[in-house]
């Protein structure tokens, strides 16, 4: 476009979920309830872990760090989406869009590394139980969590710097409900091959290497479990890892479907539904997956909030049932 007057885009318009006006208020209510559920669940986990000395162990330290991440994660996306549903205010400034993209990308990258750290914790617990407290110390846990956040936010800063240097002109309509990389680059009117290459390389590093580390940990865990002679021992070992493995499977399945496929840059409506899975639904399901069948945590929650054991299980089960009913409705 050299030699031509180029009007740079100063604001973007988020298409969101085009529906009838009446349905916008219903979607606002559904996502508001989901957002509140995420806040309540994850805050309850953080408060329970930090107030119960019986939970001052590496597994629960990682869990509380994950809960902190989930609160930040959903708070980056949902408030702007709720504003669009309620006030029909779908504009977002260029700086606001880049900021939202930066935090979203940072939190996704951080979660990848944090899940790999949690897989290592499970590996040591299953394969080296007698040396667990020697190998997985509080200092190591702090270093792993710190490395997860530092690496995630540093890599994302590089990615967003390259993306923000691209010129955007002409159409400013983002066919999405938040600022994601693919729909943003679709609006570029200058060559963005460098930004795309940098994004691909960094995404490969931060997604694939933690995934390989997680898979390697579970390969060793599987071999160790198969060597356990008793069925009861096998079941206990599997139960120790089942929650984390479920979360890893859901998280990476959604990410790989969204970004590791041909023509991912074509922003289609189906992408929005997958994005809802890992930006809104996953943060509310993760605490339930980790804690619903964890008797130790439910007992600590009972002591922390003065609830009976049956009440804790009943409220968690009711919350999961209500959430599934809400999101079984078509958007």
From Swiss-Prot:
Positions of disulphide bridges: 97-189
Record keywords, A-Z: Cell membrane, Disulfide bond, G-protein coupled receptor, Glycoprotein, Membrane, Olfaction, Receptor, Sensory transduction, Transducer, Transmembrane, Transmembrane helix
InterPro entries: GPCR_Rhodpsn (IPR000276), GPCR_Rhodpsn_7TM (IPR017452), Olfact_rcpt (IPR000725), Olfactory_GPCR (IPR050516)
Localization (cell): Cell membrane
Extracellular membrane side: 1-25, 76-99, 161-196, 259-271
GO MF entries: G protein-coupled receptor activity; odorant binding; olfactory receptor activity
TM spans (from-to): 26-46, 55-75, 100-120, 140-160, 197-217, 238-258, 272-292
Superkingdom, taxonomy of origin: Eukaryota
Cytoplasmic side of membrane: 47-54, 121-139, 218-237, 293-331
Known function: Odorant receptor.
Protein known as: Olfactory receptor 6B3
């Amino acid at each position: 476009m050299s030699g031509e007057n180029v009007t740079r885009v100063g604001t973007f318009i988020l298409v969101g979920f085009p529906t009838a006006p009446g349905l916008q208020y219903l979607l606002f209510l559904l996502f508001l309830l989901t957002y509140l559920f995420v806040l309540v669940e994850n805050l309850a986990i953080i408060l329970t872990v930090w107030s119960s000395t019986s939970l001052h162990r590496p597994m629960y330290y990682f869990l509380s760090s994950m809960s902190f991440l989930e609160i930040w994660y959903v708070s980056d996306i949902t408030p702007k989406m709720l504003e669009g549903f309620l006030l029909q205010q779908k504009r977002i400034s260029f700086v606001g869009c880049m900021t939202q993209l930066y935090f979203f990308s940072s939190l996704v990258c951080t979660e990848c590394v944090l899940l790999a750290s949690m897989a290592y914790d499970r590996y040591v617990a299953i394969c080296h139980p007698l040396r667990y407290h020697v190998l997985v110390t509080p200092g190591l846990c702090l270093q792993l969590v710190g490395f997860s956040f530092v690496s995630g936010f540093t890599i994302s800063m590089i990615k967003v710097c390259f993306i923000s240097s691209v010129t955007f002109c002409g159409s400013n309509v983002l066919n999405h409900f938040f600022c994601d990389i693919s729909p943003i680059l679709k609006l570029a009117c200058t060559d963005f091959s460098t930004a795309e290459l940098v994004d691909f390389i960094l995404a490969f590093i931060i997604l694939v290497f933690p995934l390989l580390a997680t898979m390697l940990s579970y390969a060793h865990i599987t071999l160790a479990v198969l060597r356990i002679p008793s069925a009861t021992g096998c079941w206990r070992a599997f139960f120790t890892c089942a929650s984390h493995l479920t979360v890893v499977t859901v998280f990476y399945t959604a990410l790989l479907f969204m970004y590791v496929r041909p023509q991912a840059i074509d922003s289609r409506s189906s992408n929005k539904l997958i994005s809802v899975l890992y930006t809104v639904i996953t943060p509310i399901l993760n605490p339930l997956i980790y804690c619903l069948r964890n008797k130790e945590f439910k007992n600590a929650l009972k002591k922390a909030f003065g609830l009976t054991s049956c009440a804790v299980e009943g409220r968690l089960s009711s919350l999961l049932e209500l959430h599934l009913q809400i999101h079984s409705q078509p958007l």
